[in-house]
Design a protein with these regions (language model features):
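Short, glycine/charge-rich beta-strand/loop segments that flank catalytic centers
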Residues: 46-53, 114-120
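Active-site rim/adjacent substrate-binding subdomains
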Residues: 2, 53-55, 100
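Charged, often glycine-rich, active-site loop that binds/positions anionic groups
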Residues: 48-72
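Acidic carboxylate-rich catalytic motifs and surrounding loops in phosphoryl-/glycosyl-chemistry enzymes
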Residues: 41-52, 299-308
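Short glycine-centered helix-capping/turn motifs at secondary-structure transition points
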Residues: 33, 37-40, 62, 70, ...
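Glycine-/proline-rich flexible loop or hinge segments
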Residues: 10-16, 49-53, 75-88
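A general "terminal functional-core" signal
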Residues: 74-329
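N-terminal low-complexity, Ser/Thr- and acidic-residue-enriched intrinsically disordered segments
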Residues: 1-50
Length: 329
């Protein structure tokens, strides 16, 4: 039995047909965890969908109405890059509910993992890049509204920059400063983003991503690390370690939201980095070890993963749970 809870529903499945996004990966990760005896049935919690009040903490009423009524324009649907359906919208509402539940559990158990979520390309008023609702942002804003947390940090290790995250949590920004090195570290000299309505609840955003990849426009996070093509394990882990310590010297979050994307993998169809499966597990271990040493609860979502062999994506996501078990046991 795990010392923390996993959040999962069969209804996490995204009904998008033949698509590069492996919609079946969530179920396959759940099955692998049970078959390999990493987890048992009692470790899983079933989420409820987020309600519209929660969704509206992040998304505009006009956008939510379009999603509820199926009235997205053709351009809006094409920008989202997945075919709209009522069932698809319901799956995203459920993913947001799953991230809320995982965040709540993380405060109780030090860590919790949603076997889904991480839809970081969703903006307040539109979706992009396979993302309709920004589940992580909804979870953060819900916990802030409930006075469970004041501050949060997002650590996004998907191969693609979290453009939606950066915009949602944007503070008052000045010029980003590029620094020399193997990769480019851009730090925005700003306050972290404040909640709508002038509340003092703040969010600090970190993104490590391939520079020469989607999205073309990368709005500034609190810290962006622009990684070069085909970066391998050792250099990636060095940049991650450096970035975490820089961020945590500047900001003390009540909750760390970790987007554990599988797409920095060397054989990912939509990525251009060169991490190995072992290197990605070490990445997860590093994030968990840093958070544990500083007594920061961690909520995890799976984010992207498009390996040529779906089994590799499943292994990478499964290893995230294994790494959490090893660090937090």
């Amino acid at each position: 039995m795990l010392p923390f809870k996993l959040v999962y529903s069969d209804a996490y499945y995204l009904p998008i047909g033949n698509h590069v996004f492996p919609a079946e990966k969530y179920r396959r990760v759940r099955d692998r965890l049970i078959v390999s005896c990493v987890a048992d049935a009692a470790d899983f919690l079933e989420p409820e969908p987020a309600n519209d009040r929660d969704i509206l903490l992040v998304h505009t009423p006009e956008y939510v109405e379009k999603l509820r009524t199926g009235t997205l324009s053709l351009r809006e649907e094409m920008e989202m890059e997945i075919p709209y359906s009522r069932n698809l919208a319901e799956a995203f509402w459920l993913a947001a509910g799953g991230s809320i539940l995982a965040a709540q559990q993380a405060l109780a158990d030090r860590v919790s993992i949603s076997i889904g979520g991480g839809f970081h390309h969703a903006f307040p008023d539109h979706g992009e890049g396979f993302c309709m609702i920004h589940d992580v942002a909804v979870a953060i804003r819900r916990l802030q509204r409930d006075n469970k947390i004041q501050t949060a940090m997002t650590v996004d290790c998907d191969v693609h920059q979290g453009n939606g995250t950066a915009v949602i949590f944007a503070g008052k920004r000045s010029v980003s400063v590029p620094q020399a090195g193997v990769a480019g570290l851009r730090m925005s000299h700003t306050r972290p983003g404040r909640m709508r309505g002038g509340h003092s609840s703040e969010v600090f955003t970190i993104s490590l991503h391939q520079h020469n990849n989607y999205p073309l426009w990368k709005p500034p996070s609190s810290i962006d690390v622009d990684l070069p093509d085909r970066l391998e394990d050792e250099d990636y882990l060095a940049w991650l370690d450096k970035t975490l310590h820089i961020g945590l010297r500047q900001f003390k979050p009540d909750l760390l939201c970790y987007l554990a994307g599988a797409d920095p993998y060397k054989d990912d169809q939509l990525g251009g980095l060169a991490l190995t499966i072992d290197g990605l597990k070490k990445r997860d271990e590093l994030v968990f070890q840093v958070a544990r040493s500083r007594h920061i609860p961690v909520m995890v979502t799976l984010a992207g993963g498009y390996a040529q062999k779906v089994e590799d994506t499943v292994t990478i996501h499964t290893n995230t749970v294994v790494a959490a078990k090893e660090v937090f046991t």
